[in-house]
């Protein structure tokens, strides 16, 4: 199986460029791996797919102001996207435009210098007056995905954020949860479904394409995550009682599956903090999650491959084509699927 096997035609008009008028009013395709069935539902009815004793695991990372516009002395516009808000990488940014080592940029009266270009589309920057992350915090905007082909607007500050976002650190939202509302979470809880929160700060890999044709040649980015002891215990108790661990998105999936050896070794009694660099593609054996909520992903993306690993590629692509035929909206602001 090659990366090109995960290519498909995604018409531009199927990409959701804006969120729905009302949070939670999107559609939902339901996949049953055991029967191969594909049914159509609504995201607002997600609670009907869950069972008493299940555990819904959410990513409570909060999207930071990671997008900043700078200019060269010539006036040329350079778009910068802060990659990670960590000490060791806080001066790395994706950029759009032409840059060379030694270039000077100006952003809101602050001079930036291009110290290095470590890889294609990534610049290492220094800030003349202090911390680069502080500059982004003060003057940056919400980093909506580049494929939306528009600047962030006021509505994105609220809608490109989950209702339970808490800990700042992501440069992209955990989009599978964007349509979860307080009302829907109350219905899920009332049904006897547990809820646990983990943190994974979404970083670099969300925006970088796979450039190799072979899975083995692709190097995944690292993303910090934390699974609190309370969440670990809930996962262990759910597993022991026969309930399903339902991952709200690929970010939760990466955190839980990367942490699987430590969680299992500790008997689900210990907190786990690490950096996930796990690349999940068909052939991977899942150790923690039993069901997955996720969006419709871009062709040739690592998240599409993760979803195919969980759902089986043939069933997943059949669902994708059915979604396209039925007018579903794709990518971050689009519709979703529930895979059990």
Curated annotation (Swiss-Prot):
Catalytically driven reaction(s): 7-aminomethyl-7-carbaguanosine(34) in tRNA + S-adenosyl-L-methionine = epoxyqueuosine(34) in tRNA + adenine + L-methionine + 2 H(+)
Keyword Heme: no
Matches recorded under InterPro entries: QueA, QueA_dom1, QueA_dom2, QueA_sf
One GO BP annotation of this record: queuosine biosynthetic process
Subcellular location: Cytoplasm
EC number: 2.4.99.17
NCBIfam families (UniProt xref): PRK00147.1 (NF001140), queA (TIGR00113)
HAMAP family named among the record's database cross-references: QueA
GO terms for cellular component: cytoplasm
Keyword annotations: Cytoplasm, Queuosine biosynthesis, S-adenosyl-L-methionine, Transferase
Purpose of the protein: Transfers and isomerizes the ribose moiety from AdoMet to the 7-aminomethyl group of 7-deazaguanine (preQ1-tRNA) to give epoxyqueuosine (oQ-tRNA).
Pathway given in the UniProt record: tRNA modification; tRNA-queuosine biosynthesis
Taxonomic lineage: Bacteria, Pseudomonadati, Chlorobiota, Chlorobiia, Chlorobiales
Subunit text: Monomer.
Species, as recorded: Chlorobaculum tepidum (strain ATCC 49652 / DSM 12025 / NBRC 103806 / TLS) (Chlorobium tepidum)
GO molecular function, one term: S-adenosylmethionine:tRNA ribosyltransferase-isomerase activity
Pfam family for this entry, one: Queuosine_synth
Sequence similarity: Belongs to the QueA family.
Protein name from the UniProt record: S-adenosylmethionine:tRNA ribosyltransferase-isomerase
């Amino acid at each position: 199986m090659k990366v090109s096997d995960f290519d498909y035609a995604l018409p531009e008009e199927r990409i959701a460029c804006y969120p729905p008028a009302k949070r939670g009013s999107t559609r939902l395709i339901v996949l049953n791996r055991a029967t191969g069935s594909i049914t159509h539902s609504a995201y607002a009815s997600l609670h009907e797919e869950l069972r008493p004793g299940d555990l819904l695991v959410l990513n409570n990372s909060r999207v930071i102001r990671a997008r900043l516009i700078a200019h060269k002395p010539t006036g040329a516009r350079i778009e910068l996207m802060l990659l990670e808000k960590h000490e060791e990488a806080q001066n790395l940014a994706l950029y759009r435009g032409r840059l060379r080592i030694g270039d000077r940029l100006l952003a809101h009266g602050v001079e930036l210098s291009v110290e290095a270009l470590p890889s294609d589309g990534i610049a290492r920057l220094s800030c003349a007056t202090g911390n680069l992350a502080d500059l982004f915090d003060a003057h940056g905007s919400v980093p909506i995905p580049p494929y939306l082909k528009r600047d962030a607007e006021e509505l994105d500050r609220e809608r490109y954020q989950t209702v339970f976002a808490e800990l700042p650190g992501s440069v992209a939202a955990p989009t599978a949860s964007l349509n979860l509302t307080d009302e829907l979470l109350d219905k899920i809880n009332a049904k006897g479904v547990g809820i646990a929160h983990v943190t994974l700060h979404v970083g670099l890999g969300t925006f970088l394409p796979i450039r190799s044709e072979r899975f083995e040649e692709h190097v995944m980015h690292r993303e910090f995550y934390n699974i609190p002891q309370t969440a670990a215990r809930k996962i262990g108790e759910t597993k022991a009682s026969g309930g399903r661990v339902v991952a709200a998105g690929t970010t939760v999936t990466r955190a839980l599956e990367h942490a699987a050896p430590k969680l299992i070794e500790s008997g689900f009694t210990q907190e786990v903090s690490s950096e996930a660099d796990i690349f999940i593609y068909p052939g991977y054996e899942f150790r923690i999650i039993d069901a997955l909520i996720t969006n419709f992903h871009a062709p040739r993306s690592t998240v599409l491959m993760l979803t195919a690993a969980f759902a089986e590629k043939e069933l997943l692509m059949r669902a994708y084509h059915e979604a396209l035929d039925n007018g579903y909206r794709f990518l971050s602001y689009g519709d979703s699927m529930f895979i059990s």
